Amino acid sequence: MAAKHVIYGEEARAKLKAGVDKLANAVKVTLGPKGREVIIEKKWGVPVVTKDGVTVAKEIELKDQFENIGAQLVKEVASKTADVAGDGTTTATVLAQAIFTEGLKAIASGANPMDLKRGIDEAVALVIEEVKKASIPVTSNKEIEQVATISANNDPVIGKLLAEAMEKVGKDGVITVEESKSSETTLETVQGMQFDRGYLSPYFITDADKMQAVLENPYILIFEKKISNIKELLPVLENVVRVGRSLVIIAEDVEAEALATLVVNTLKGVIRAVAVKAPGFGQRRKDYLEDIAILTGGQAITEDLGIKLESVTLDMLGQAEKVIVDKENTTIVGGKGDKKKVEARIEQIKKQIKETTSDYDREKLQERLAKLSGGVAIIRVGAATESELKEKKARVEDAVHATKAAAEEGIVAGGGTALAKASRVLENYTSANKDRELGVKIVYNACKYPLKQIAYNAGYEGSLVLEKVYEDQDKNYGFDAANGEYKDMVKAGIIDPTKVVRTALQNAASAAGTMLTAEALIAELPEKKEKTPTPTDMPPDFD
């Protein structure tokens, strides 16, 4: 076991702060409509130019191990916020830095870290309650377009496309983002569906950046039972390899021996495959598998048919243009089933919905109907250069998440307004425990930081802007940094999804609280490498 280096107390917190500041100072310049660009050097290829906070955060690794702990904790805040809400990564980073910096000052003046954390947690709960009260449900297509435009760094073309995509596939529909072969950004709707089951092994991953297994033009084996014996599966695998295609296996389970063989052959490049558990249970699983079979033009191999796995032929397998599998979901894009059969299946489910007397059954049938009829919207992102394409694609992916978040929990005034106004609930907070009160005060001040930073990035004096916005009693009155005007943010279409604001504050406070209550840091000592002697190190020749 390698030797470790341990530091404590004040020294540990100072190192954490140095790491937090290095990461946060690079990320926060991207905040707002006038956020600055960050240029990231790449070992291969051209540098990446981005205004996406999470992209900047992911690139930062610090040489000092203890500083790096602080940077990685804040990076986790940005990543978690992006995963859950799709946006708000920079806001979360700014909040984490603000809470941690203010908290350190309090600890230096003698405050108890645990009481501070309790105060911070209480304040966050109160502010989130206020944000929820101010939330406006998203109903119109215009509002969806506004959210998408802001999330895509104020790109109205992307906003319009996303609103159109959501109109076609519904709020719960599947929207995927791909790279276009031309410089145009286009929208297409195809047959497809998504279900909540992920890959059975991470070794199937083909895209390490997104942690996804992406298979182009695969065959799809739809099997009702467990696959435990690899011998049963071999004929299918051999047939698929022979035609040079990839394979998606959807089954009740793929057990140890069969899964191990599949993984080994995938890693060796013998076959491109991914195994996924079938969705649902009992009769519902059969129904789901039948839906997938009709959508992909295959056959659900169930017990009732009396077909053994080893006798399955290629014409019994489903097909699709693409299948994307991540840790939690499987998305079938462009199922190659007969459209008439898909429509007949949809009509059959609609009839069952009308006839059922059980609310639970009706809910599950409606779920199946939405999956089967919604289809999949594909946004193909185009750009003139490779670096622009990557940056634009990341923005579109953020916008997809944020737009869905808005449909889920509603919207609030954007531009940092919602948090600044919600912090009013903490203005007159008092407690018998003064350190706890101090924790609440820290969140009260931190909630105003995003608004100040947005104004500062746009070239305005943050404190003056904050003062004017905060004093106005209208919950939607804020500062439009793009035009340098004070206005009703919701009417102007400057809005944030409530889920984004909530998630950013919760994640930031959680990470900052963890760092404030940390009393020791442990890191591995770097190994000293033996210096290889060079000709200049040789002893002199005494001949």
From Swiss-Prot:
It catalyses: ATP + H2O + a folded polypeptide = ADP + phosphate + an unfolded polypeptide. ATP binds at residues 30-33, 51, 87-91, 415, 480-482, 496. PROSITE patterns: CHAPERONINS_CPN60 (PS00296). GO terms for molecular function: ATP binding; ATP-dependent protein folding chaperone; isomerase activity; unfolded protein binding. Keywords: ATP-binding, Chaperone, Cytoplasm, Isomerase, Nucleotide-binding. Its main location: cytoplasm. It is an enzyme of class 5 (isomerase). GO terms for biological process: protein refolding. Its EC number is 5.6.1.7. It is found in: Cytoplasm. The keyword Isomerase applies. Signal peptide: none annotated. It holds the Pfam family Cpn60_TCP1. One of its GO terms (cellular component) is cytoplasm. Belongs to the chaperonin (HSP60) family. Together with its co-chaperonin GroES, plays an essential role in assisting protein folding. The GroEL-GroES system forms a nano-cage that allows encapsulation of the non-native substrate proteins and provides a physical environment optimized to promote and accelerate protein folding. Forms a cylinder of 14 subunits composed of two heptameric rings stacked back-to-back. Interacts with the co-chaperonin GroES. HAMAP family: CH60. NCBIfam families: GroEL, PRK00013.1, PRK12849.1, PRK12850.1, PRK12851.1. This is Chaperonin GroEL.
